[in-house]
Amino acid sequence: VTTDKNKYFYRTSKDSTKIVNKDNEKEALKLLSNEPYFLKPVYINNDNLITVFQPNPKTFISQRSLSNIVRIGKLLKEFHSKKFQAENTFNPIDQFNSYYNQIDELPYGLDDYMYIIDEFKKLYKADRLCHNDLVEGNFLFTKDALYLIDFEYAGYNDYYFDIASFISENDLNYEETITFLKAYFTDEECNYDKLKVFLNFCDLLWYTWATLLYEKRNEEIYNEIAKEKLHRLKNPRKIVY
């Protein structure tokens, strides 16, 4: 959006199949208002959010490199280390159930992976504010800074969900994954058993989401995503270093 005096980013509502609670976003914006990686909005109202335009903006898809993965790992560590206490929650199981229950014809074999839900529940422990939507487009690279944007799904959650989500949603390869984990886990040991379960859960979650979207919209991109996530479910990542 361009005015006589300035340029702005304008964001409106995204995917209607996702569970969005606007109170979650408003709370996150308030909690993060003084963080260096946060792009403070000049206007927000329901689905509409406006921030000051950043020159030459790029997202992770065009800036994918090991050095930038290190930057992302450090940013997420800084975010999580503050342990912001949010009243509004993001429950991954509720998210999964929402997708699962909207599918008219469940794909053959989906129920074979339902054991992942039980494993996830045993390890899940919400204890801080998380972003919960770490797709490539939510990392904004400018000349001098890296911002984490779009907090529509932010809420009280287990921070391992964010860690697994970044790896899963961006389909990091082995080298990228290890680079990310080394950048993130600087003062604590990574719980690989927990991360493995959370990675499997994220792949199951996005497989179910993509299956739903392909059924409802019949757009090939969702079929491709479903195939990729099913491949990951059948061939889990090996991440110990």
Specify the residue positions occupied by each region the protein language model found.
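ATP/Mg2+ or Mg2+-diphosphate-binding catalytic cores
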Residues: 209-241
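Active-site activation/catalytic loop segments of kinase-like enzymes and analogous catalytic loops
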Residues: 160-189, 200-217, 232
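ATP-binding pocket architecture of kinase catalytic cores
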Residues: 1-90, 107-108
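Active-site acidic catalytic loop and adjacent metal/ATP-binding pocket
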Residues: 1-5, 10, 118-163, 175
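An alpha-helical support segment within catalytic cores of ATP-dependent transferases
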Residues: 84-132, 137, 142, 234-237
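Short amphipathic alpha-helical segments and their helix-coil junctions
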Residues: 145-148, 177-194, 237-240
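Charged/polar, low-hydrophobicity segments characteristic of intrinsically disordered regions
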Residues: 113, 196-205, 230-241
